[in-house]
Amino acid sequence: VTAKGADNYTAKIRVQATNGISYFEIYNADIKTGAKGSLIEGTGKSFDSQTEYTEEFHMTGLTDNKCIRVSVTDTEGTVIERNLLVKITPSVLFSETVNIETADDYYGSYYATWLNGRVYLRSNGEQYVPEIDFSMGMIDGIPSLISPAQRSQYNLPTFDGLKDTKFELTTLTITEYNNISKVNAEPISTLTDPTLSNIGISANKVYLFKTADGKKGLIAITSMTKRTGTIETANGEWVKDTEYYRVVITTKVIA
């Protein structure tokens, strides 16, 4: 495990073979499955029956976890392989791609950055009040990011205890957002804190948010689709053919 924000790691590898070492190689490996990948250039070495070998393998420019497979072949042709997984300690937490709605229909309109990004309906969100960071809704027909604590001001369904959150549109492009790595929070931390309790949203834009408890991050709007459904109002009535938006987002949050 690397130090927080570190983008390099040196693995100290020591191998022994009673029958003598013939070949030593290091391969890339899949960080999730551990499956063996391509041979890393310059790591293949052959020996004349020596029984021990030590190498320091330097990994630099790390922006995500890194897995390697060390392969040793002895003089009798026996191959022994072991994986080494280097886990970075991120400065920025990435979410998965999720669907969120401007009204509670199928996915929900409340978002929490924990657990790689979670979306909740009002019906199941009350048990996660401390985790909910922002919400979405329709304000005067405009799909918007809305401070969870301010939903009642816009006549939107809500529940008690939700936190206050501020928003701002950034000048970042989606490409610039995608280029923010897990080991460098500076592109987020240096942005001026947001001040708006709600803001209309558009596809392919990047928004800044900061919660009352200090969590600061970015929201990238990948796509927006207009839909209709039977939607509950703030007074508990259900209205057919109500227009709302289904929005695809990811978030990147300072750890």
Q: For each of these PLM feature ranges, what is it?
A:
Residues 176-236, 254:
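Acidic, glycine-rich flexible loop segments
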Residues 7-13:
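Structural beta-strand segments of beta-rich domains
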Residues 1-4:
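Short, compositionally biased P/S/T/A/G/V-rich stretches that sit at domain boundaries
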Residues 75-195, 255:
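N-terminal "domain-start" segment
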Residues 9, 22, 64-68, 217:
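Exposed beta-strand face motif in extracellular beta-rich ectodomains
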Residues 240-255:
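Short, low-complexity, Pro/Ser/Thr/Gly-rich segments in the mature regions of secreted, periplasmic
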Residues 49-51, 58-65:
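Surface-exposed, short loops/turns at beta-strand junctions within beta-sandwich domains
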Residues 13-38:
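Solvent-exposed loop/turn segments flanking beta-strands in beta-repeat/beta-sandwich domains
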